[in-house]
Amino acid sequence: MPKRSCPFADVAPLQLKVRVSQRELSRGVCAERYSQEVFEKTKRLLFLGAQAYLDHVWDEGCAVVHLPESPKPGPTGAPRAARGQMLIGPDGRLIRSLGQASEADPSGVASIACSSCVRAVDGKAVCGQCERALCGQCVRTCWGCGSVACTLCGLVDCSDMYEKVLCTSCAMFET
């Protein structure tokens, strides 16, 4: 014969230990209050951070930054081809970045390390794409346009009998 069911099952609640943590409170009964507190605290921290930054900026005053002039035409009257990274000057015109300026005037360049093999270089070879300094062993010349490329920017085409190094500009047009 089966056991008879408890006549008080619907009336008596289950007596289980329930652990209520911060997570249950923030998702359940107190969800609205906790989310409002978090929102207010976040907003207050953002405004305090922005105010501290602005106070720091205004305390320094307005400093005038002297940037190099835009490139002037050479003696032939035609500007040099703009290859590699260019920057927008304060007047809105494009200016050469430091790597291209040092390529044009190598007299003020200090001895630095090669970006590929970390050997000391004299600063004359600079990648035409990313403007990293290169030593003599790491210089790769593009088969298409003849520009200098580093090991990261130079793509090696092994489809022919001989390997061809292509810069990223020329690699777009090769099929």
UniProtKB/Swiss-Prot annotation:
Name the gene behind this protein: SIVA1
How this chain assembles, per its entry, is:
Binds through its N-terminal region to the C-terminus of CD27 and to PXMP2/PMP22. Binds to the C-terminus of TNFRSF18/GITR. Isoform 1 binds to BCL2L1/BCLX isoform Bcl-x(L) but not to BAX. (Microbial infection) Interacts with coxsackievirus B3 capsid protein VP2; this interaction inhibits the binding of SIVA1 to CD27.
Record protein name field: Apoptosis regulatory protein Siva
Q: State the UniProt keywords alphabetically.
A: Apoptosis, Cytoplasm, Host-virus interaction, Metal-binding, Nucleus, Pharmaceutical, Phosphoprotein, Zinc
Report the InterPro entries cross-referenced here.
Siva
Q: What cellular-component terms does GO give this entry? A: cytoplasm; mitochondrion; nucleoplasm
Instruction: Provide the function of this protein.
Output: Induces CD27-mediated apoptosis. Inhibits BCL2L1 isoform Bcl-x(L) anti-apoptotic activity. Inhibits activation of NF-kappa-B and promotes T-cell receptor-mediated apoptosis.
UniProt-reported outcome of changing Y53F: No effect on phosphorylation or apoptotic activity
| Phosphoserine found at | S70
Tissue expression remark: Ubiquitous. Mostly expressed in thymus, testis, ovary, prostate, small intestine and spleen and less in colon.
Top-rank taxon of the source lineage equals: Eukaryota
Lineage, top ranks: Eukaryota, Metazoa, Chordata, Craniata, Vertebrata
Q: Which PANTHER family match?
A: APOPTOSIS REGULATORY PROTEIN SIVA (PTHR14365:SF1)
Q: Does the keyword Nucleus apply?
A: yes
Q: How is it modified after translation?
A: Phosphorylated by ABL2/ARG in response to oxidative stress.
**Pfam families, per the entry:** Siva
Q: Where is this region: Interaction with BCL2L1 isoform Bcl-x(L) and inhibition of BCL2L1 anti-apoptotic activity?
A: 36-55
Region annotation (Interaction with coxsackievirus B3 VP2) ranges: 105-123
A biological process (GO) of this protein is: intrinsic apoptotic signaling pathway
Tell me the GO molecular function terms.
Answer: CD27 receptor binding; metal ion binding; tumor necrosis factor receptor binding; virus receptor activity; zinc ion binding
Tell me yes or no: is Methyltransferase among this UniProt entry's keywords.
no
Q: Which residues carry this modification: Phosphotyrosine?
A: Y34
Give compartment(s): Cytoplasm; Nucleus
Organism from which the protein derives: Homo sapiens
